[in-house]
Amino acid sequence: MPYLIVTYDIAEERVNKVRKILKKYFMWVQNSVFEGEITEGKLLKCKLELEKVIDKEVDSVYFYSLENRLNYRKTVLGIEKEITGNIL
């Protein structure tokens, strides 16, 4: 199962809608950053939901895919938000 890091740059009036969608699929780790494992089917569903909300002329959502969550290293400077878990 791929492990994704998702970041976004969204116009203020759509930020809450985008955040709400991403929270259904990923763990929220910072203001505009989410991460987590996801199936291809759920990833497709997430992207379809986002496409209905974003304005492709001004908004951006970036998906960084890693083979799995064991093949990357994360270093945090400062406080790391508590991850309570995510059911996919």
Swiss-Prot record:
Keyword field: Antiviral defense, Endonuclease, Hydrolase, Magnesium, Metal-binding, Nuclease
InterPro entries: CRISPR_associated_Cas2 (IPR021127), Virulence_VapD/CRISPR_Cas2 (IPR019199)
Top EC class for this record: hydrolase
Pfam families: CRISPR_Cas2 (PF09827)
Keyword Oxidoreductase part of the UniProt annotation: no
Cofactor or coenzyme needed: Mg(2+)
Enzyme Commission number, as recorded: 3.1.-.-
Binding site for Mg(2+): 9
GO annotation terms (biological process): defense response to virus; maintenance of CRISPR repeat elements
GO-annotated molecular function: metal ion binding; RNA endonuclease activity
Superkingdom field: Bacteria
Protein's UniProt keywords contain Cell membrane: no
Family: Belongs to the CRISPR-associated endoribonuclease Cas2 protein family.
Assembly and oligomerization: Homodimer, forms a heterotetramer with a Cas1 homodimer.
Summary of the function given for this chain in its UniProt record: CRISPR (clustered regularly interspaced short palindromic repeat), is an adaptive immune system that provides protection against mobile genetic elements (viruses, transposable elements and conjugative plasmids). CRISPR clusters contain sequences complementary to antecedent mobile elements and target invading nucleic acids. CRISPR clusters are transcribed and processed into CRISPR RNA (crRNA). Functions as a ssRNA-specific endoribonuclease. Involved in the integration of spacer DNA into the CRISPR cassette.
The name this protein goes by in its record: CRISPR-associated endoribonuclease Cas2 3
Native organism: Thermodesulfovibrio yellowstonii (strain ATCC 51303 / DSM 11347 / YP87)
Gene: cas2-3
